[in-house]
Swiss-Prot record:
The protein's name: DNA replication licensing factor MCM3
CDD domains found in the cross-reference section: MCM3
Subunit structure: Component of the MCM2-7 complex. The complex forms a toroidal hexameric ring with the proposed subunit order MCM2-MCM6-MCM4-MCM7-MCM3-MCM5; loaded onto DNA, forms a head-head double hexamer. Interacts with CSM1.
Comp. bias (Basic residues): 761-772
Motif window: Arginine finger: 541-544
Domain MCM stretches: 359-566
MF terms in GO: ATP binding; ATP hydrolysis activity; chromatin binding; DNA replication origin binding; helicase activity; MCM complex binding; single-stranded DNA binding
Species of provenance: Saccharomyces cerevisiae (strain ATCC 204508 / S288c) (Baker's yeast)
Catalytic activity: ATP + H2O = ADP + phosphate + H(+)
Broad enzyme group: hydrolase
């Protein structure tokens, strides 16, 4: 600056250029000449910044020229002005990362000096880097001089730190003034504030400028006497000075607190922490909850020494780390959005995999393959990771695209394990617990800044998880006051704060996946869902999917789970012999910051893709199936067949993250008319279904169907949401609400439903149609009949029930058909599918059972249902019976004994049947109920008459039901 002078005695930030300093500068210049990759990095930053600055200045010049044109161009000109003004100058910081391994290979003494005496080796190295940048700087555009390399360049370090890789607990006095690497969790972050480096003052009388440099313990690597924080008011001649703030130099300044990782802390001791000072381009890189690796110089502030109150004792000095680099640890980070670098090789594999017909099953089976079962929950989690499409309408309405999931059920059903898997898989996920989180801890809190004393906002878990996932365990343990705080977040996706003079709105656009236990500790099937969950309907309706996970007693399933758990305990990591103790994994950072640079060539040449997935090379897409750990995926691949031999294809977790990231960023599906028709029909069916009267079916359920269908379209990388996506969404929602698993029958039922609708008469309602049977003699007078009762899994207005009713409509074509035509055997594939559903204990309609157990051609004898226990005194009723079924007498049957597990099974089935239409008159015949119960069970689990009567007697004694007049009455 022309005519500027400094003040005598001022401390400067530069070292005096002595001979040793110059030798170190020349030595580091030789290092940069040897490793040309660093020179290329400097040049690339210069070119990027100059081009960006040139484009920015050109846009500003064009905007100024357009201002002279007036308002002739109307709205178009205004839009161009807004677009030009929104363009911001985006330049890269003048900082490059140096590998300590390369420096050790070049000059071991210089490498040792960087680690042991950074205050005397880093400044000459940065001086050499700045001189190199100045010599390479040729500004190609006259308007881009603002980003010239005359600004000093900084060095960051990565590589092996050896004994200097520490934690906050292992930092000792011997590490003072040395370069260290510290791993930990960020617990506190201060506000980013400007720090004065140089003040400029103007003397009006002499017309000269004066400056003063300011240093403190956090500015320089060496501990010097700090500069007084007082502006000069007069120059040496006594002339009055005016501070020119525009000419003064400021840098950003932030203080963070890094705490020791809990897994590294010794048993029984609290984690320790250390303060880190971040300046300039390092500020605002982390937030509370992030796991980071900080590289910096460990030094003392100098504040300490003799105790003021008692001069005979000494107190310790305050220490901190002057940050040099901050590396986020994405593998275990809970607050940093881990963005994967997608190479051309990855994109090709993603596109090839998306064309597979079973892509939804492949990706869902790859989610937590070690967890046995829960196939529908895994599919829902995959759709939650994909998310729907967020929309902000012109009228100010906000339609969220994030999917919320709630899991409620018995203990020990892997609910928390699923949450942990989401926490370690999602790009941005934060974990909380119900009792350990408060309302302000989830949303935002108003605190006092310890440096300035001002009121400030601290973001809670949901604000920190913006554009991510919040995992809340033990959701039922939260108090009502704290739970109310998340109502706004789950629907409006904002947090409104009005306290302590602060009124603001924060974004909290996150998905919520929560796990809760029932009110009574175990889910009671005899009670309604809302009585078991004990959460208000206003909160339940905000969850898109609510899964009830029960620990049912099933001998086959229990044996398979126990074998799976035992196989997991038998697993040995690679390289270990049987009986050899597994050594504790050492968390030593042998290479700090190596993940910062990703070489695409390594990814493209080191693994096999989708096309050569069977080769012996390392595969980055599919992983090898491990029967000891991934038996759950094999069960899902074989559709619940415990003896299945089909091996699943499992995608690796890193590739799954890339697939989800690609689908969320690149694909925005649009609804089609056929998908809209399916969504509207399923929504109206659910609203008019008697089985969903006790569950809140609101307009949010309609948006749930849209979000699920859109997320499924993202799984296929489709630009449109078609009928298949809507059917999958409806199937998943119906399973969450009613426990129905339509499975592979959904396409068949939909086609038959539409065909029946096209043929039915418009004068008659399908609910009032009765099944009309024509006698074999074709006499012309139909037999009086009543509508066939549906099972617990049937729904009045669903396609399945409509198909069953409309198939036997009273038109001329069906009136003459023989009843035996209905009992024709099924094809082999359909029969195998029904057998599979029976083995799993899934609900199968009685009519499909009749198809399954139909006699072969040429067989004689009456039609009897296979597996139903034959009871004594069975007589057919030809008269006009209420149920049009065979009357079974229990007069000569004595109640037997029933085990606890079998009693729980029959209680659950009866409780579910009591909520269906068969108990419309508050009662149902004992014999007919016996047949209904056995219709829902596989062959090996059907109840005998003695077990059935024993179960009724126990339930009657417990006042769960009443038996009178050969009927079971609902209490």
């Amino acid at each position: 600056m022309e005519g500027s002078t400094g003040f005598d005695g001022d401390a400067t930030t530069f070292f005096a250029p002595d001979a040793v300093f110059g030798d170190r500068v020349r030595r580091f210049q030789e290092f940069l000449d040897t490793f040309t990759s660093y020179r290329d990095s400097v040049r690339s930053i210069q070119v990027y910044n100059s081009n960006n600055a040139a484009n920015y200045n050109d846009d500003q010049d064009d905007a100024d020229e357009r201002d002279l044109l007036g308002d002739d161009d109307g709205d178009d000109l205004e839009k161009e002005k807004k677009a030009a003004s929104s363009t911001s100058l985006n330049i890269l910081p003048h900082r490059i990362i140096i590998s300590l391994d390369d420096l050790r290979e070049f000059d071991r003494s210089f490498w040792s000096g960087i680690l042991v005496e950074p205050a005397y080796f880093i400044p000459p190295a940065e001086k050499a880097l700045t001189d190199l940048a100045d010599s390479m700087d040729d500004v190609p555009h006259p308007n881009a001089s603002a980003v010239s390399s005359r600004h000093p360049w900084k060095l960051s370090f990565k590589g092996s730190f050896g004994a200097h890789a520490l934690s906050p607990r292992t930092l000792t006095a011997q590490h003072l003034n040395k370069l260290v690497s510290v791993e930990g969790i960020v617990t506190k972050t201060s506000l980013v504030r400007p720090k004065l480096i140089r003040s400029v003052h103007y003397a009006a009388k002499t017309g000269r400028f004066h400056y003063r440099d300011y240093t403190d313990a956090t500015t320089t690597l060496t501990t010097r006497i700090p500069t007084p924080a007082i502006y000069p008011t007069e120059d040496t001649e006594g002339n009055k000075l005016t501070t020119e703030y525009g000419y003064s130099t400021f840098i950003d300044h932030q203080r963070i607190t890094v705490q020791e990782m809990p897994e590294m802390a010794p048993a029984g001791q609290l984690p320790r922490s250390i303060d880190v000072i971040l300046d300039d381009d390092l500020v605002d890189k982390t937030k509370p909850g992030d796991r980071v690796n900080v590289v910096g110089v460990f030094k003392s502030l100098g504040a300490g020494g003799m105790n003021q109150s008692n001069s005979n004792t000494l107190i310790g000095f305050k220490t901190l780390i002057l940050g040099n680099t901050v590396y986020p640890l994405h593998a275990r980070s809970t607050g940093v959005a881990a963005r994967q670098m997608l190479t051309d090789f990855d994109i090709r594999n993603i596109n090839k995999l998306s064309k597979k017909k079973d892509i939804f099953d492949i990706l869902s089976q790859s989610l937590a393959p070690s967890i046995y079962g829960h196939d529908h929950i895994k599919k829902a989690i995959l759709l939650m990771l994909m998310g729907g499409v967020e929309k902000n309408l012109e009228n100010g309405s906000h339609l969220r695209g994030d999917i919320n999931i709630l899991m409620v059920g018995d203990p020990s059903t892997a609910k928390s394990q699923l949450l942990r898997f989401v926490l370690n898989t999602a790009s941005l996920a934060i974990a909380t617990t119900g009792r350990g989180s408060s309302g302000v801890g989830l949303t935002a809190a108003v605190t006092t800044d310890r440096e300035t004393g001002e009121r400030r906002l601290e973001a809670g878990a949901m604000v920190l998880a913006d554009r991510g996932v919040v995992c809340i365990d033990e959701f039922d343990k939260m108090t009502d006051v704290d739970r109310v705080a998340i109502h706004e977040v789950m629907e409006q996706q904002t947090v409104t704060i009005a306290k302590a003079g602060i009124h603001t709105t924060l974004n909290a656009r996150c998905s919520v996946i929560a796990a809760a236990n029932p009110v009574f500790g175990q889910y009671d099937v005899n009670r309604d869902p809302h009585q078991n969950i004990a959460l208000p309907d206003s909160l339940l309706s905000r969850f898109d999917l609510l899964f009830v996970v029960t620990d049912d007693i099933n001998e086959i399933r229990d044996r398979s789970i126990s074998e799976h758990v035992l196989r997991t305990h038998r697993y040995l990591p690679p390289g270990y012999l049987e009986g050899e103790p597994v050594r504790e994994r050492l968390n030593l950072s042998l290479a700090v910051g190596e993940d910062a640079d990703i070489n695409p060539e390594e990814h493209s040449n080191s693994g096999a893709g989708v096309e050569n997935e069977g080769e012996d090379d390392e595969d980055h897409v599919f992983e090898k199936f491990n029967p000891l750990l991934q038996a759950g995926a094999k069960l899902a691949k074989n559709k619940g067949n415990y003896n299945g031999t089909e091996i699943p294809k499992l995608v690796t977790i890193p590739f799954l993250r890339k697939y989800v990231q690609y689908a969320k960023e690149r694909v925005i599906p649009q609804l089609t008319q056929e998908a809209i028709n399916v969504i509207v029909k399923n929504y109206t069916d659910l609203r008019n279904d008697d089985n969903t009267k006790k569950s809140p079916i609101t307009a949010r359920t309609l948006e749930t169907l849209i979000r699920l269908a859109t997320a499924h379209a993202k799984v296929r990388l489709s630009k449109t949401v078609n009928k298949v996506d809507a059917k999958v969404a409806a199937n998943l929602l119906r399973f969450a609400l009613l426990g129905e698993d339509i499975g592979n029958d959904i396409d068949e039922e939909e086609s038959e439903y539409e065909e029946a609708l096209s043929k039915r008469s418009p004068q008659k309602s399908p609910k009032k149609r009765q099944r009309v049977r024509q006698p074999a003699s074709n006499s012309g007078s139909p037999i009086k009949s009543t509508p066939r009762r549906s099972t617990a899994s049937s729904v009045n207005a669903t396609p399945s029930s409509a198909r069953r009713i409309l198939r036997f409509q009273d038109d001329e074509q069906n009136a003459g058909e023989d009843d035996n035509d209905i009992m024709s055997p099924l094809p082999a594939d359909e029969e195998a599918e029904l057998q599979r559903r029976l083995q799993l204990g899934l609900r199968v309609s009685p009519r499909r059972r009749e198809h399954l157990h139909a006699p072969e051609e040429g067989s004689s004898g009456p039609l009897t249902e296979v597996g139903t226990p034959r009871l004594p005194n069975v007589s057919s009723a030809g008269q006009d019976d209420e149920q049009q079924q065979s009357v079974i007498s229990f007069d000569n049957v004595e109640p037997g004994t029933i085990s606890t597990g079998r009693l729980s099974l029959i209680s659950g089935i009866i409780a579910r049947l009591m909520q269906t239409e068969i108990f419309e008159e508050e009662s149902y015949p004992v014999a007919s109920l016996f047949e209904r119960i056995n219709e829902e069970l596989p062959e090996e689990e059907k109840f005998s008459a003695q077990e059935y009567l024993a179960g009724l007697k126990i339930m009657s004694d417990r006042n769960n039901l009443m038996v009178a007049d050969d009927k079971v009455w609902r209490v």
